[in-house]
Amino acid sequence: MPSNPTRKGRVVVGMSGGVDSSVTAWLLKQQGYEVVGLFMKNWEDDDDSEYCSTRQDLLDAASVADLVGVEFEYVNFAAEYKDRVFAEFLREYSAGRTPNPDVLCNAEIKFKAFLDHAMALGAEHIATGHYARVRTVETPAGPRHQLLKALDDTKDQSYFLHRLNQAQLARTLFPLGELRKTEVRRIAHEIGLHNAAKKDSTGICFIGERPFREFLNRYLPSEPGPILTPEGQRVGTHHGLSFYTLGQRKGLGVGGVKGRQRDDGTAEAWYAARKDLARNVLYVVQGHDHPWLLSAQLQAQDASWIAGEPPAAGAYGAKTRYRQVDAACRLDQAGGERFALAFEQAQWAVTPGQSAVLYDGEVCLGGGIII
């Protein structure tokens, strides 16, 4: 990379203290941008908890900014996060669905509140360490911005970014989209970043590494109820429907019930298959390929299309969960805020509250919330 690059515009980089955002800041500095690193604090509660790493992450981000030689700032979006993301998270779980707060956080915080803050700082662009790409194509109506999958398909994060719009993509840079994670780690080591080997963050940001049920218990009342088979046999008691997601295998509390057995005499695994909120019943089935776990079609609501309008009916690929291989499907209808997908092969554990994201090859078209 050039050591004396031509000066480009001002870009504010969301720096989390992790290796991806750190290398992002360094790459943009090398490319000639005036870089400002910005650490976002999105959660206030439990800062003293053994599970919370916010303080260390802030120190890591500040240290990297100093080493790279960029301005560094701190902003607290905790109030916005609770209002726009966490409140919706609780509403969805209360309704028996399994939301994906990372999708909402990207749309409402990282590419809205953060973007607005960056523009107030005089930035022309924002950048993050997400693995995705932006491409601008000319159309008769003017330039259109497309969200593309990352070059490294094992790290592609376009699924979490599918609710971004044209205005947001026009201001966004994803420097890591053309790199593989191994290259990012190599760069971090070569330039002497102290966090080069730092473990990638996992799980929901405000929960951290703490047990999920323990966290949710603080905010939602638990209402135990029966666990039934499709035939109506009671095989256990659940702790509250909010604590279970479709396809869940561990933590059901029915391990002592044999039921259906394999040829070798061992019992087939149990899976959470359906929730009956009206009766407070959790239904479980045995066997990974039980019909109750398979869906040939789905309906989605709260649709968001990157182009600003729904794609035409036809054949596409779709993901109903992160890191899933695109499933061949047909978009049968897309009008208003709803759409329907029909799959060539039935999909496993399609979960209400999760996102169904549509792709045309490497181009992410948008998506909606599964109902």
Curated annotation (Swiss-Prot):
Residues the entry annotates as binding ATP: 14-21, 40, 129
Protein keywords: ATP-binding, Cytoplasm, Disulfide bond, Nucleotide-binding, RNA-binding, Transferase, tRNA processing, tRNA-binding
Site (Interaction with tRNA): 130, 354
Active site: 105 (nucleophile), 205 (cysteine persulfide intermediate)
Any GO BP annotation: tRNA wobble position uridine thiolation
Disulfide topology: 105-205
Pfam family, one: tRNA_Me_trans_M
Subcellular location: Cytoplasm
GO CC terms of this entry: cytoplasm
EC annotation from Swiss-Prot or TrEMBL: 2.8.1.13
Catalytic activity: S-sulfanyl-L-cysteinyl-[protein] + uridine(34) in tRNA + AH2 + ATP = 2-thiouridine(34) in tRNA + L-cysteinyl-[protein] + A + AMP + diphosphate + H(+)
GO molecular function terms noted in the UniProt entry: ATP binding; tRNA binding; tRNA-uridine 2-sulfurtransferase activity
Stretch list, region Interaction with tRNA: 155-157, 321-322
Enzyme class, broadest EC rank: transferase
Secretion signal span: none
CDD domains: MnmA_TRMU-like
Family note: Belongs to the MnmA/TRMU family.
Name used for this protein in its record: tRNA-specific 2-thiouridylase MnmA
Lineage: Bacteria, Pseudomonadati, Pseudomonadota, Betaproteobacteria, Burkholderiales
Gene responsible for this protein: mnmA
